[in-house]
């Protein structure tokens, strides 16, 4: 194409020619482009970041991009797809086989963001050691950690588990009952932990929690721990376990537990299921009393 042009109005004046038909050339707008040299200068940095954080990129792809695509295509959430797999591959009434089936599905099919077998062994061992009469779990999710706790409870033990999302809670309820645990042993409460904790004593006859598992949103851990303290639900010697304290992390919760003087703290270092290079951990707190 030619250079853009337009007519210029005539210039009147004595001794000047008529320029009414003169053409005025207008330069074409320049499009800003990055110099190839600058782009090449950034290439080593980009490659370094991709290599260093490749595990996080893989996790992002599996937990966000692929999961969202499958949600749209199937019309089901990942927890619902996982339960459908369990129904066709696991043995009803066998919680151990159900847990193994979930692990297999998460590693071979779709990443479930569950506790996984390594953390699961830590959780079961601590429940067996403490032999709590009553356990409170905040964050049921699909019911994986719920089954771990229920398997390790002493005879007559009771587990209350709280899940804020009704649709996720419906899946967890079916999984718990499929494993063979009735409502007298494992009771699932649908609601936010912030609303449920103040009602535990009056509505659910929970006067004390010998062991608490925090497995919901790490940013809510500190708030919920202080709510448990405020409502006197933690007896002296109670154990509080908190998952995901390193990834995505709960720094304010850990700082409070270490500095308030009411807890003895220990950290069990682990990795994420299927992503062992991404470091995480379970915090174990032992409550000394109100002080």
Swiss-Prot record:
Highest taxon of the source?
Eukaryota
Q: What miscellaneous comment appears in this entry? A: LRRC51 and TOMT were originally considered as alternative reading frames, LRTOMT1 and LRTOMT2 of the same LRTOMT gene in primates.
Its UniProt entry gives the catalysed reaction(s) as: a catechol + S-adenosyl-L-methionine = a guaiacol + S-adenosyl-L-homocysteine + H(+)
Residues that coordinate or bind S-adenosyl-L-methionine: 137, 139-140, 145, 163, 193
- Cellular component GO terms, alphabetical: endoplasmic reticulum; plasma membrane
Transmembrane spans: 31-51
Q: What is this protein called?
A: Transmembrane O-methyltransferase
Organism of origin is Homo sapiens
- Give the record's family classification: Belongs to the class I-like SAM-binding methyltransferase superfamily. Cation-dependent O-methyltransferase family.
The job of this chain, per UniProt, is described as: Catalyzes the O-methylation, and thereby the inactivation, of catecholamine neurotransmitters and catechol hormones. Required for auditory function. Component of the cochlear hair cell's mechanotransduction (MET) machinery. Involved in the assembly of the asymmetric tip-link MET complex. Required for transportation of TMC1 and TMC2 proteins into the mechanically sensitive stereocilia of the hair cells. The function in MET is independent of the enzymatic activity.
GO BP terms, alphabetized? auditory receptor cell development; catecholamine catabolic process; developmental process; dopamine catabolic process; dopamine metabolic process; methylation; sensory perception of sound
